[in-house]
Amino acid sequence: MIQIFNPSRLTRQPFFIDLVDYLDQHDDVILREIKAQFPDVAVDKLMEEYIKAGLILRANKRYSLNLPFLESTDDLALDQEIFIREDSPVYQALLEKTFETELRNQTNAAILVESTDFAREKMTLSNYFYKVKNHYPLTEKQQELYAILGDVNPEYALKYMTTFLLKFLKKDQLMQKRRDIFAESLVVLGYIVQNEEGKYELAVDFDKERLSFYLS
């Protein structure tokens, strides 16, 4: 099976995804066969777009895949659109590869340093912002955060989250009398935990000189 990571406007279309599966399983396909397989789709128009983008190859009235499959993870950049076969040798390397992201804000000098997988399925704030912005499917845990934050402005959220976290410069425990969605979000993300007394404690490494919080 072929997987598409970080799909574009074209490659996230349901028809394109189905077409990739179909062409991957059939050889020497002609346009009439594609139209018969997808009777409710504007095949001609969309096929021209895919051919123009270099994703589908047309030769002698036959159609085939022309996807630039990932062959190595050496120069792979986070958020890069890639096509990969699940049975390829590089697929396992892709799943095991990790990246580091940094979130900064305009209110203070705090930095949220987070470790993530390429698919951005790990529970981090950077991954949440990225997926919501691009309308990508959320994991179950990310949906839990969405129920609290929704489609929040990242700068707005970072302002309040980092301001809260920076209070740990002076205190080991923090009390929040009223409900605070940003404190709740930090709990879901794993930055803080609530002890038996209902007070919040820091649950990640904190470099006080660099004002950096490390979510691994």
PLM feature spans:
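Short, Lys/Arg-enriched N-terminal segment that forms or immediately precedes the first helix
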Residues: M1-R9
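Short amphipathic alpha-helical interface segments
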Residues: T11-E33, R85-K177
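N-terminal interaction modules that seed assembly of large macromolecular complexes
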Residues: D28-E81
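Short amphipathic alpha-helical interaction segments
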Residues: Q37-K52, D172-L189
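A short, conserved structural fragment
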Residues: I51-R62, A183, V187-K199
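Minor-groove-contacting beta-hairpin "wing" of winged helix-turn-helix DNA-binding domains
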Residues: R62-P68, G198-D205
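Short, amphipathic alpha-helical interaction segments positioned at domain boundaries
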Residues: F69-R104, F206-S216
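Charge-dense, extended regions
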Residues: V187-G190, Q194-E197, A203-S216
